[in-house]
């Protein structure tokens, strides 16, 4: 079988390529160039010139062909621009989902299919075929599971996608890379968004969109408590960085882009047990309203029990059994049935 491996320059995709080569497949390595480096912020893991060099070195060690594909235009259009606009609109985006949906599993999958190949990545997730339908499941290594970022995949994509490391632990993945003598075997992980490696999201937004208008920080009654330098600097549930002096501890309840106000209050005011989902996507159809499900409202969220209701017009609402703290507009809510990903959408 011919397989294109999306090689990020990290240990996971390196091990994925090695495993497929061991299994006798015809493996082709491709790294996506998603960022121009001159005059822009340094790009982090999976994007930088050093990562491209590491991916090339791994391909040479494994004896597989290697190519670099330019995806800068689609990355700018589908990932960078929506990321910035979300922050300016008072939402907290999660660009990795958009990158997976539009870049890795659209742009790159199309190119793999044009070569008569399937596409493999280093994601920690699993795909199984059950009665002719494809099921997306959590990874075996719960601490590394990345299924949350993959809820936009559907039957058409899953039939041609492989996740070779999804059934392994991180230690086992590193052992595979070590056994093959790959330069990435002990490479550290990056926990930040790849195009904002220093974690300064507000600074990145300002580099792209320029200085943003200041506004008031108010309590839930509308009383002015202080000022801020742009709502893009805040997210729902945030406590640090409000600079309101002493007194009671306050948290961000909501952001109002129309008035440029940041509304704050006590911790209990950040909880929500119901919310809607924009642009819902289901891996193989939505769950019935009577079915109990687990809902993860951010990547590191342990999950909350609840139910999902889909109206005849496709509008989706989530009702949790108990309020969850910091349900944040712009983040993804992903719906699970045990280890099976059912789908999800964007919190409003």
Curated annotation (Swiss-Prot):
Binding site for ATP: 6-13, 32, 122
UniProt name for this protein: tRNA-specific 2-thiouridylase MnmA
Keyword Disulfide bond included in the entry's annotation: yes
Residues annotated as catalytic: 99 (nucleophile), 194 (cysteine persulfide intermediate)
Positions of region (Interaction with tRNA): 144-146
Site features described as Interaction with tRNA, chain residue numbers: 123, 331
CC per GO annotation: cytoplasm
Annotated TM spans: none
Classification via SUPFAM superfamilies: Adenine nucleotide alpha hydrolases-like
Single GO BP term: tRNA wobble position uridine thiolation
EC number: 2.8.1.13
PANTHER family tied to this protein: MITOCHONDRIAL TRNA-SPECIFIC 2-THIOURIDYLASE 1, TRNA 5-METHYLAMINOMETHYL-2-THIOURIDYLATE -METHYLTRANSFERASE
Pfam families documented for this protein: tRNA_Me_trans, tRNA_Me_trans_C, tRNA_Me_trans_M
UniProt source species: Myxococcus xanthus (strain DK1622)
């Amino acid at each position: 079988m011919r397989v294109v491996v999306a090689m990020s320059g990290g240990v996971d995709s390196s091990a994925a390529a090695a495993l497929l080569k061991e299994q006798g497949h015809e493996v082709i390595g491709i790294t996506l160039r998603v960022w121009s480096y001159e005059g822009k912020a340094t790009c982090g893991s999976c994007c930088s010139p050093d990562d491209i060099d590491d991916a090339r070195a791994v391909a040479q060690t494994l004896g597989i062909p290697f190519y670099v594909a330019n995806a800068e235009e689609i990355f700018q259009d589908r990932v960078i621009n929506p990321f910035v606009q979300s922050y300016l609109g008072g939402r907290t985006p999660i660009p990795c989902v958009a990158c997976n949906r539009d870049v890795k599993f659209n742009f790159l999958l199309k190119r793999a299919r044009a070569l008569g190949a399937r596409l493999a990545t280093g994601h920690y997730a699993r795909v199984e075929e059950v009665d002719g339908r494809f099921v997306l499941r959590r990874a075996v290594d719960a601490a590394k599971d990345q299924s949350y970022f993959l809820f936009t995949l559907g039957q058409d994509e899953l039939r041609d996608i492989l996740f070779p490391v999804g059934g392994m632990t991180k230690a086992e993945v590193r052992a595979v890379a070590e056994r093959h003598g790959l330069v990435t075997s002990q490479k550290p992980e990056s926990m930040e968004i790849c195009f904002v490696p220093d974690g300064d999201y507000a600074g990145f937004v300002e580099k792209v969109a320029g200085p943003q208008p200041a506004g008031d920080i108010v309590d839930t009654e509308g009383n002015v408590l202080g000022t801020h330098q742009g709502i893009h600097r805040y997210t729902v549930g945030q406590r640090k960085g409000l600079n309101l002096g002493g007194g009671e501890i306050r948290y961000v309840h909501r952001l109002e882009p129309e008035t440029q106000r940041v509304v704050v209050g006590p911790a209990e005011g950040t909880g929500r047990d119901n919310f809607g989902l924009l642009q819902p996507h289901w891996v193989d159809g939505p769950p019935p309203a009577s079915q109990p499900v687990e809902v993860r409202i951010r990547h590191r969220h342990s999950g909350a029990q609840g139910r999902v209701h889909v109206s005849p017009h496709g509008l989706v609402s989530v009702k949790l059994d108990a309020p969850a703290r910091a349900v944040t507009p712009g983040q993804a809510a992903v719906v699970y049935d045990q280890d099976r990903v059912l789908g999800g959408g964007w919190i409003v």
